[in-house]
UniProtKB/Swiss-Prot annotation:
Gene Ontology CC annotations of this record: cytosol; DNA helicase complex
Organism, as annotated: Mycobacterium leprae (strain TN)
CDD domains on file: DEXQc_UvrD, SF1_C_UvrD
Record protein name field: ATP-dependent DNA helicase UvrD1
Cofactor: Mg(2+)
Record's catalysed reaction(s): Couples ATP hydrolysis with the unwinding of duplex DNA by translocating in the 3'-5' direction; ATP + H2O = ADP + phosphate + H(+)
Name of the gene: uvrD
């Protein structure tokens, strides 16, 4: 492969790349040689540093753009990185410089190396979570499994966990032993069948994209060497969020510890950026030890700390520093800014979640009405998706425009998934999940029995579902009645006709699918208002397809005008395959409204990672909510919850609101929650409490509440001598005035001498006498 280098720029241009950087940022940009770990605190300018480092490689060190691989965690971050680099060095990087997510990077490698994986070719489909679950549903039914006990969701999560650890189906079976439980045995069996059907469908799931790429690099040294020679500079953003498979992928691409290397080529330059204090995706398989142990894995590492914050005021940063400092074993790091203290954090204790939502709505109205901000300056963050309901119930009648990020996505709607399934079948006829989805959509007289017969025929003859349909159309499957055969023959002819149009403009192809399949006609003939909304969504997809075709053509023309060589590591799969790939790799963060959208953003704390807003409301500061109830007994999980609180606080630029509800509905019942232990960790002088005592409606004196509004109802807290004897049992949920929320583990004794061992999370496991402890049963 030819390597295209860029002539070094004059010193003045190089100096421009370093303008405005603080000493630590400058050191990170110009570093050469040894692996580089940039520990970048929230808002410390890591994106600026990464973009400047890439530009510096090109302009000052004459590194060819094709020798650079930059990996991000979201499409949005990748697009921003490309734009920043283009502004710094000119828009001549073309397709040769890879700036993309882990999954997109691996797709590009796999498209070119698919022939090395048995049963796969370069136009493979990418199964998302719903596709995987649909396939697992089929497998479960065919294997006669109890779907309630072994649900597709459970099986998908278990298989995903194995793949993230690079454990293949054969190894999962080999690892079984005599004392292995039924679930693990079932997972191993289903895993093998799942992989077999994926190959038959010429498909990979999300986890396969990483795992199969690692497999190729490890099994074929010459391929690994090819990519190591190409990518002499590898940069990885958000390294604290990598899982084991991604960790191994990076090592293979760089060449550290490479096995079977054909020669002694030195490893590539590796630069990773991350912050262990913002590691919040353990539930997705991320491994915080990847960044914590980086200096051990790469002994000659240079480590640079970025602690100067360019986003938030000092009051906000001081609150964040105080919370995260309680995590044990972390790298000492304190964020600071020279932007001044700023306004105090606003605290609010509400009676319930509806009062909390009304307070937030009133504050937003006041700020917008006063001309201080616009709606798109505001984000409301919460620990769990269900907390958006009360906000929406208040925002709608109030007239506050909003968008829920991570809620129901455009690409998850039935009509869009139906149309995408048609397109996927045209691109990859072996995609059985998509084929079976559209077989009778819209209704064309192919019932469940006919579909089952086709499936059985495919299984018995060892052919794909598509080949089985063709056999039916040719009259080779006698078990079907004439009506079903005719309907299936018509469906096969429809696909053949549409397949002749795949080289048309993508927007025109989508229109052809809608019209010729009868899908559009069925919706237009309906009087259901919901069907009209589906039409609007389909019109939007048609527009997007036209735009995508135009963008593809413009990009090709630009590359040609700049004489940018085509990237030989990326085969031209055509506009349809590129479009399907883009849709498949969409993530929640791609739904985030633009800055000028004119809407308030509602999202979970997890989804807010990497974002910032002038005004941020973080709701639900209660033990049981933040931290979440299920984490209270596990110090490791509680540490991650504290990191989540830290992430929420550091999203705010100028104004930060922290609110909690005294009672919050759960399963239709009001639940009394104490204030979050994290809230108690913020210095009181940083918070301006707009409301911190109970309303008269609770009939509780003000002296019965702490500065955070902790409830001490007279009916419960009127003194041990006057209250009913507390009766507890293992598993009961309690709150203690000092230790917060906990769960009862053991109870000994009876009556007034009863003693409970209670797990209070980070406060420890404590024995308390029922008759004297300030404990309330929830």
């Amino acid at each position: 492969m030819s390597v295209h280098t860029t002539d070094a720029k004059p010193d003045s241009e190089v100096d421009r790349l370093l303008d405005g950087l603080n000493p630590q940022q400058r050191q990170a940009v110009v570093h050469e040689g040894s692996p580089l770990l940039i520990v970048a605190g929230a808002g410390s300018g890591k994106t600026t540093v990464l973009a400047r480092r890439i530009a510096y490689l090109i302009a000052a060190r004459s590194v060819g753009v094709s020798q650079i691989l930059a990996i991000t965690f979201t499409n949005k971050a990748a697009a921003e990185m490309r734009e920043r680099v283009a502004r710094l060095v000119g828009d001549h990087t073309g397709p040769s410089m890879w700036v993309s997510t882990f999954h997109s990077t691996c797709v590009r490698i796999l498209r070119n190396q698919a022939s090395l994986i048995g049963g796969l070719n370069s136009n493979f489909s990418i199964y998302d979570v719903d596709d995987s679950r649909s396939l697992l549903q089929m497998i479960g039914q065919d294997m006669g499994l109890d779907i309630k006990r072994y649900s597709p969701r459970l099986m998908a999560n278990a298989i995903s966990n194995l793949k993230n650890e690079l454990i293949d189906a054969e190894s999962a079976v080999a690892n079984l032993s005599s004392d292995t439980d039924d679930l693990a045995r079932t997972v191993a069996t289903v895993y093998g069948e799942y992989q077999r059907r994926l190959r038959t469908a010429n498909a990979l799931d999300f986890d396969d994209l990483i795992g199969e790429t690692v497999g190729i690099l490890q099994a074929f040294p010459q391929i690994a060497e090819h990519y190591r020679r190409r990518f002499r500079h590898v940069l990885v953003d958000e390294y604290q969020d990598t899982n084991h498979a991604q960790y191994v992928l990076v090592r293979e691409l760089v060449g550290h510890g490479a096995r079977n290397s054909p020669d002694d080529m030195p490893p590539g330059e590796l630069c990773v950026v991350g912050d262990a204090d913002q590691s919040i995706y353990a539930f997705r398989g991320s491994t915080i030890s990847n960044i914590e142990d980086f200096e051990r894995d790469y002994p000659d590492t240079t480590t640079i700390l970025l602690e100067q914050n360019y986003r938030s005021t000092q009051n906000i940063l001081s609150a964040a520093n105080s919370v995260i400092a309680r995590n044990f074993g972390r790298r000492d790091k304190r964020l600071w800014t020279d932007a001044g203290k700023g306004e105090l954090i606003v605290g609010y204790v509400s009676d319930n979640e509806h009062d909390e939502a009304k307070f937030i709505a009133d504050e937003i109205d006041a700020l917008v009405g006063g001309g201080e901000i616009t709606y798109d300056d505001v984000a409301v963050l919460y620990r769990a998706n269900n907390l958006s309901r009360s906000l929406e119930e208040v925002f709608i009648p109030t007239g506050i425009p909003y968008k829920v990020v991570g809620g129901f996505c455009f690409y998850e709607s039935k009509e869009i998934r139906d149309l995408i399934a048609y397109l996927r079948v045209l691109d990859n006829p072996g995609d059985a999940v998509s084929m079976r989805r559209i077989l009778n959509t819209p209704r064309r007289g192919i019932g469940d029995r006919a579909e089952a017969c086709v499936s059985v025929y495919a299984e018995n003859t060892g052919t794909s579902f598509a080949d089985a349909l063709q056999a039916v159309a040719e009259g080779k499957v006698p078990m079907l009645n004439t009506r079903s055969v005719k309907a299936i023959a018509g469906f096969v002819a429809l696909l053949d006709d549409l397949r002749c149009r795949v080289d048309d403009d993508l927007g025109e192809l989508v229109e052809s699918v809608l019209e010729r399949s009868g899908y559009l006609r069925e919706l237009e003939s309906s009087t259901d208002p919901q069907e009209l909304a589906r039409l609007d969504n389909l019109n939007e997809l048609v527009s997007f397809a036209h735009e995508f075709s135009t963008e593809q053509a413009n990009a090709a023309a630009l590359a040609k005008s700049l004489h940018t060589p085509e990237d030989e590591d990326v085969p031209d799969t055509g506009a349809l395959a590129a479009f399907l790939e883009k849709v498949s790799l969409m993530s929640d963060t791609d739904q985030i409204p633009e800055n000028n959208s004119g809407v308030v953003t509602l999202m979970t704390l997890h989804a807010a990672k990497g974002l910032e807003f002038p005004v941020v409301f973080v709701t639900g500061w209660e033990d049981g909510m933040l931290p979440h109830m299920r984490t209270l007994g596990d110090p490791t999980e509680l540490s991650e919850e504290r990191r989540l609180a830290y992430v929420g606080i550091t999203r705010a630029r100028q104004r930060l609101y922290l609110s909690r509800a005294i009672t919050r509905s759960s399963w239709g019942q009001p639940i009394l929650n104490p204030e979050s232990r994290f809230l108690r960790e913020i210095p009181p002088e940083l918070i301006d409490w707009r409301r911190s005592i109970l309303t008269d409606s609770y009939s509780t004196p003000a002296s019965g509440a702490s500065r955070f509004g902790r409830v001490r109802p007279s009916s419960i807290r009127s003194g041990a001598s006057k209250r009913a004897l507390l009766v507890l049992a293992p598993g009961d949920r309690v709150t203690h005035d000092k230790y917060g929320l906990g769960r009862v583990e053991e109870v000994s004794g009876v009556g007034e001498s009863a003693i409970s061992l209670i797990d209070f999370g980070s406060s420890g496991r404590i024995k308390l006498m029922h008759n004297h402890a300030p404990v309330t049963k929830l």
